[in-house]
A protein has these predicted regions:
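Extended, charged/glycine-rich binding lobes that contact polyanionic ligands
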Residues: 1-40, 47, 55-60, 65, ...
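Classical protein tyrosine phosphatase
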Residues: 313
């Protein structure tokens, strides 16, 4: 199912260097001076601000490597967002303590200065992308680009959200239904051999978040199939604190939850000590600074997306490779 009506270009990302991501962090980490009661003073702080460039490694694995190299505590590094493994990515991190610049074949860390704030997840504005699509069947089909500029983009969660097996949401659904034997069957098929009490709360919550994302995508699917104008409302990411209304998103959510035999109260699981209160997410987002250049049967795309939005969703609309 596609939101745009124009024909796709085809094409694919063939290697990491064809998918470049630059994080746009919160400006507060770059303030060199601050206004205090005693006047304007230069910012000093216990945190080192550094630029992390990486390729072929996840943000979490890169952070673990840096922690080991500089003998840092587990919570000694802060970052705003997680970047994919199959990409060349740039992001800022904060480090409690001193570091030296270093470079490997996958990680390049450069010290920028100091800050008085520890970076937290979510403290970014968005991301800038430079993506090269190779072997495009119809590189001249640029009408789809103009359509996206005018009509915005459905803010689907990308496939990364659902794990390499594509079934993280199914594990989450089973957790919420208290079907713990089935949960263990699914998890242990991946090569593990664990009991439920050996799985961290963080991991269990991760599966529930995948189910929340699955529900959001289902609601958005229904909207895209019914309407031609984008909705710039927020759709629910359901949790125990979600207040269902008599609007489109709430009605669709009720239908899916009833089908899955799950209630709002299921998102608070006392026996596991898990509580997911829920939140909301923009149904559609504007694609910023979308530009393109055709080189033979390749297309070079540049654009920005707000935090939490997936470039893979945009690529699906442009290429129309996925039925």
């Amino acid at each position: 199912m596609y939101w745009t009506k124009s024909k796709g270009t085809g094409g694919s990302v063939l290697k990491e260097e064809n998918f470049v991501v630059e994080e746009i962090p919160s400006r507060k980490f770059f303030m060199k001076y601050s206004r205090l009661a005693g006047g304007i003073k230069e910012v000093q702080g216990p945190y080192t601000l550094a630029l992390l460039r990486k390729k072929g490694i996840t943000t979490k694995d890169a952070v673990k490597f840096i922690q080991m190299k500089f003998n840092l505590k587990k919570d000694g590094i802060g970052y705003a967002g997680l970047k994919d493994k199959f990409a060349v990515t740039t992001q800022y991190i904060t480090i409690k303590g001193e570091i030296k610049d270093f470079k490997t074949d996958r990680i390049d860390l450069t010290k920028i200065g100091y800050t008085d704030k520890m970076m937290q997840v979510g403290e970014l504005i968005g991301n800038k992308f430079t993506i090269t699509l190779r072997n495009c069947k119809n590189p001249q089909n640029m009408a789809v680009m103009e359509e996206i500029k005018k009509r915005a983009m459905p803010n689907y969660f990308g496939p990364q959200r659902f794990g390499s097996h594509g079934d993280n949401h199914e594990v989450g659904r089973l957790i919420l239904r208290n079907e713990y034997e089935k949960v263990l069957d699914l998890i242990n098929k991946r090569g593990y051999n664990k009991n439920l009490d050996e799985i961290s709360k963080k991991t269990l919550k991760f599966f529930i978040h995948a189910y929340q994302s699955f529900l959001f995508n289902k609601i958005l699917d229904t909207y895209v199939s019914k309407y031609s104008k984008p909705s710039f409302e927020e759709f629910p990411l359901v949790g125990y604190d979600t207040k269902l209304k008599n609007d489109f998103a709430s009605r669709q959510l009720k239908k899916v939850l009833e089908k899955d035999k799950i209630s709002i109260n299921n998102f608070s699981i006392r026996c596991l000590g898990l509580r997911c209160n829920g939140s909301s997410r923009s149904a559609f987002v504007k694609v910023g600074e979308l530009n393109y250049k055709i080189e033979g049967n390749s297309i070079i795309l540049t654009f920005t997306l707000p935090k939490g939005s997936y470039a893979t969703t945009l690529l699906k609309e442009i290429t129309k490779n996925v039925p």
